Structure formats: structure tokens, C-alpha cells
Amino acid sequence: MAFPTTSAQQAETNRKILEEIQTKKQLLAGGIINLGLSPPNQMPAPQLLGQPTTVNPDFQAGVGIATNATSTTRSAFNPTSSTTLGFFIPQDSYFGNSFIPVLPRLEPLPSPATTPTAPPSHSISK
């Protein structure tokens, strides 16, 4: 059996619980809550049209991958960027997409009606 609590102890417990709830409400209202993730996720303010873009200092110039990226991201980025016809644009994503693929626009193949026809090959008949 549990020990009976006095009304003073119960009131103290209730007060602590209410303080925790109030603190969490304030964090949620302010937009600064850590939902079990290591860094707090704060979305950047939307950028207005016509304003110059800013580059995140976490991205290395010319490399295209964040310096704080995980080894998994680096191991996926390096072989992919060396074996594709396109290139990749680095982005600062809160959703795990550290780069966007950009593929070159290829000219369509000419239709068979417009291609010159080769003379028929000579076949030897028996």
C-alpha cells in the first residue's frame, strides 16, 4: 500500500505540475520547443521577392554539402555527384534533403519521318 499523502503534499505536487504545463505552453506559444530532437527546429522567416538571398555559412563554397552533414549524407553525395550528368544545388533543409538534383535539358530525339533513311543493305540470297 502507498503512504497516504497530506493535502499540503498534494497541493505542492499539483502546483509543480501546473508550473510545468504553463512553461510548456509558453514554449509552444513562442515557437521554441525541442520535441526530442537534438537542435531546436526553428523555421527561417520567409524571404520576400527582390531581396538578396543569403547563404548558410554551414555550406562549403564549391563543395555543395554542409560541413555539419552526417557521414551518410556525404557518402551519398560524393558518388552521386561524380556519376551523373546533372549537378546538385545544396540547400539548408529541415527535412533531411541536403541537396536538390538538377538534370540538364536534353534535346528530343528526331522523329523517324525526319531522319534520312540509309540505303537498303545488300543481302546475298541463295
Swiss-Prot record:
Protein name, per record: SOSS complex subunit C homolog
One GO BP annotation of this record: DNA repair
This protein's GO CC annotations: nucleoplasm; SOSS complex
Disordered: annotated segments: 106-126
Family: Belongs to the SOSS-C family.
Domain of life: Eukaryota
PANTHER family found in the cross-reference section: SOSS COMPLEX SUBUNIT C
Organism of provenance: Drosophila sechellia (Fruit fly)
